[in-house]
From Swiss-Prot:
Similarity annotation: Belongs to the pyruvate kinase family.
Alphabetized GO MF terms: ATP binding; kinase activity; magnesium ion binding; potassium ion binding; pyruvate kinase activity
Entry binding sites for ATP: N35, A36, S37, H38, R74, K148
Pathway: Carbohydrate degradation; glycolysis; pyruvate from D-glyceraldehyde 3-phosphate: step 5/5
Metal-binding keyword on record: yes
Residues annotated to bind Mg(2+): E214, D238
Record-marked site positions (Transition state stabilizer): K212
Cofactor(s) needed by this chain: a divalent metal cation
Gene3D superfamilies given in the database record: Phosphoenolpyruvate-binding domains, PK beta-barrel domain-like, Pyruvate kinase, C-terminal domain
Organism: Aeropyrum pernix (strain ATCC 700893 / DSM 11879 / JCM 9820 / NBRC 100138 / K1)
pH dependence as annotated: Optimum pH is 6.1.
Residues the record lists as binding K(+): N35, S37, D67
Name of the protein described by the UniProt record: Pyruvate kinase
Taxonomy of the source species: Archaea, Thermoproteota, Thermoprotei, Desulfurococcales, Desulfurococcaceae
Xref: SUPFAM superfamilies: Phosphoenolpyruvate/pyruvate domain (SSF51621), PK beta-barrel domain-like (SSF50800), PK C-terminal domain-like (SSF52935)
Amino acid sequence: MRGPVKIVATVGPSSSSASILAQMLSLGVDVARINASHGGVEQWNSMLESLRRAEEAVGKRVGVAVDLEGPRVRTGNSEPVKLEKGDLVTLGFMEGDVPVDARQFFETIDEGDIVLLDDGKIILQVESVEGFRVKARVLEGGVLGPRKGVVVRGKEPDLPPLSAKDRRALEFFADKGVSHVYVSFARSAEHVEKVRTVVRRLGLRQARIFAKIEGPSGVSRIGEIAEASDGVIIARGDLGMHYSLEELPEIQELIVWEARKRYKTVVLATEFLSSMIEKPVPTRSEVVDIYQAVLQTADALMLTGETAIGKYPVKSVQWMAKISSRAYKKLATSPPERPRPTSTPYKLALGLVELAESLDSPLVVYSKTGRFAERLASFKPLKTFYVGVPSREVERVVRHLWGAEPIVVGDYPYEAGLAKTYEKLRRENIIHGDETVVEAAWSSERGIYIIRVRNLEF
């Protein structure tokens, strides 16, 4: 058994064909991530078409997450330039050796600041600032291409939550079955709510909003951001450009804890298997990183460059599934302590999870929106639980959740939906007639939750 942790895989040039995607889905990918920072409508549409063909071939529908560019500063569209260590270079607003595309960048920067280009591959130190022109010394050189990220360590320019490209992306994806929107560089609860408002206005009623924690504001305001979001993503690559690397484990632990105590989904991202961009086997430290992430009870692990541009996208998924499966066996023998809820809905969810585990029985529920399933998943059940859902839209949402297996049965009153879920589980030989099952449904007619423990007789 692979275990309850879900795998998010980024679709890119290396994985954009239906045949590659089908292999990735069959090996355990639960959510396909499309990075809206790259490409455009034509490329995104092609990815979605390939994904639909792959789903049809495998017989499995997955979550679809659009990852927005957010308030990111980038270099211009100039030709690649080689920056040598020791060079004094000019950064200007759409001019100079390093053209920068945001005026706000120059309002933030000061003499002595460290500037990181292209995910930290190139490092500069600022020597002087004059309006929209900055002189900086190259500390670590390299070839700088167009549209690369520009970060000032420890600082974040005051940019709007959504770029013009983000708005175009959301308009395109509005009717494409997107289940999750990843909000990049989330800086506050207000930031998250502004994106949620736009998403709802475009008709994405069920799409969940996940905040990506990528900078100092996200870390310092993690409590309010987690409260405003449906989940958080720990983007370790971008965090590593703002903090010293030895701080990252503590920051990761802090974010996981703040999200867990608010019952939010946690996704860990970046560099899990980065060596596999070039090599077919992971390093020992990468294996340990994935193993420890599962023990830390991350709900999902994200592959980025490994599946988007790497040489071994299928093997990357295979290794992540293999390692997480091994870690799950350890987790099952020593489960983590669960938060003790104070609200009735969460007390009910925890009670159901613990009841099913004490009986070693399957847990089956029917959820019209996926919210009940989210509450169950927040307590990290050690066995797969089955969620009857009314539509493919909700199925894609639930697919992202720890341990959840969605079953599309149609839109019914809750008790009827639960019965339909059982019928489908029986037809697919997932639940057998002699098993004791814990079931739960909401009776709108009587205004009560119904919880049963019974031996099924099909």
